[in-house]
Amino acid sequence: MASYFEDNDDLRFYFDDGVDWAALAEVTEYGFRTADGFKTGAEALVFYREVAELVGTLAAEEVAPRAAQIDREGVHLEGGEVVSGPAMEAACAALRRAELQKLTLPRELGGLNAPLLLYFFTDELIARGDVAVMTQHSFYGGMAMAMVAFSVQEGTTTFDPETARISETRFAAAIDEIVRGEAWGSMDITEPDAGSDMAALRARGEQDEAGNWFVSGQKIFITSGHGKYHFVIARTEPAGAPDDPFAGLGGLSMFLVPAYEDRPDGTRRRIVTVERVEEKLGHHGSVAAAVSFDRAPAQLIGKRGEGFKYMLVLMNNARVGVGFECIGLCEAAHRQARAYAEQRRSMGKPIARHEMIADYLDEMATDIQALRALAVTASFHEEMAQKLALLERFAPRATAREQEMFARDLPRHRRRARRLTPLLKYLAAEKAVEITRRNLQIHGGVGYTRDYPAEKLLRDALVMPIYEGTSQIQALMAMKDTLGGILKRPRAFVQKLGQARWRSVSARDGLERRVARLQALSLSAQQHLVTRTAADKLRSLGDVPVQGWRKALTKEWDPKRDFALAMLHAERLIRILADEAVAELLLEQATAHPQRRDLLERWLDRAEPRVRSLHEEITTTGERLLARISPAAPPAPSATGTPGTIAAE
């Protein structure tokens, strides 16, 4: 029996050695306090592995064989309802029979209480079979978990301190419907002319005299927009002056809008209209819909004006999920390419033994392993941060060890998750396009036909740098955080640069010296951007009295004006930051597990010249273009329309 888990040594490394499952199980099981939960990390890991084995088999046996048919059948609108093809229905039904839609939900809500990291591993496995199936599947349990998270955050979930179980949660009925596999949901953000610039959203949330909320407006490109439960971002406050707290993002709120009501007689009353399903280049089996709301009854999530805050709860995990989705797609493309190259003979030997093709295959394999290391680490820290925060808030009688975890580990997990998540989303999405494109190239002319599956994977990959926050948005976020951190702690940055340079010549391990050289190049590029930004800022103060300099240099920073060079080079910088982060993670693995040294060496062989080239571009180019566009430059996209923030789609 085929299995996408058993045939993947690198993936299994993370179940054998590469993840601190004991720590993750401890926070997932509320410190092993619950009566019906696991009592040790080892006991939990047995279950986690069984789930991965099951999903690996389902992906190989139930999903992958249907991928081509799913792509051909697509979806269509019929009588106002979206209809999926028989192959898509069969694949999703197999996942529902395995009850995977309830994998991460708490047991008291009918779930299996598994870690999010395990869920993301299943995303990778399913995506390797078909990304459309993975996408549809994710809007079951993913939306149910969002309901729990939102309820916890707004204070409408209560915990029993004695049993460490949820005693009440706001959306219990909807969650139960999803657990039974009878409903799913969507996240409705994008509108015509309002994608990354969320301050331009026009959908409205209005409250009547009785306190009831209603949503009106149109949303487009809504993945799983045919689902029942729509989390909708809508404007509840009119945009005012730039210093108005309700201007821009501050005027957005989040609502839960049921899209329809099924009557006892079997008929359905539509509340939200599905106007059309998009004719997409790829992902033919999944739904991207345009939906409209005409005073649709809605439930406010949290308080008015908190929509962006609640959206980020979903978005961070969604971006990690896209990272794993991309890895599954890359895995499928690499295996297709290798299988074809090993059987296709040219000039007396398989093309897999031709030097350039061998180089392509080696790079693809190395990139996939590197991406998985980045994805697993980002997911681990994001989940640890979320669950430690929950324990700190709700756990009764925290032990001394738990109190130490709250004080020491929680900030560390948050920092690492914030650093790694945009790097993962950027690198995984860009590599998905690169690897699927290379797979098609290795196939040659037949790859350009529908007789072979290479073209489908490329079509499926092309959306990855666009959705859940474009690659350019990830680059701007990483740049803002990186340079902002230097401006806040310049002394710590100088020390870090000095230490990297010292280790690059003094470390006993040759691989550690190489990683340190990579770090030094990254820090040098950052230093250049900060130095140039600061110098330009000082020059702009020529007409400002000296007594006003302190305020200008500490508070009056406008990314549209002051960070022009950094914004120009943001994508080059994030590529350096991603190469650096992967090298650091692989060095950690190689130090603990010597069998990973080969992977680190392969990564460095490719990353070092790449980073040197990017460093050269950052430190020597950009002035000509900035001089040309500065006089009439349009305002840069902003999440709020005000200085100091960068958008997230």
Could you say what each language-model-derived stretch is?
Residues 261-275, 280, 287-318, 335-352, ...:
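A glycine-rich, basic-preceded beta-loop-alpha segment at the flavin cofactor/substrate interface
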Residues 212, 216-269:
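A short core secondary-structure module
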Residues 151-158, 170-174, 476-526:
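A structural-propensity feature for long, helix-poor, extended segments
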Residues 2-5, 10, 17-19, 283, ...:
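Alpha-helix capping/hinge segments and adjacent helical runs
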Residues 369-425, 560-564, 587, 591:
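C-terminal helix-coil-helix/basic helical segment that borders enzyme active sites and/or dimer interfaces
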Residues 1-78, 82, 645, 649:
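Extended, charge-enriched "interface" segments that sit outside catalytic cores
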Residues 56, 88-172, 176, 223-225, ...:
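Internal helix-loop-helix
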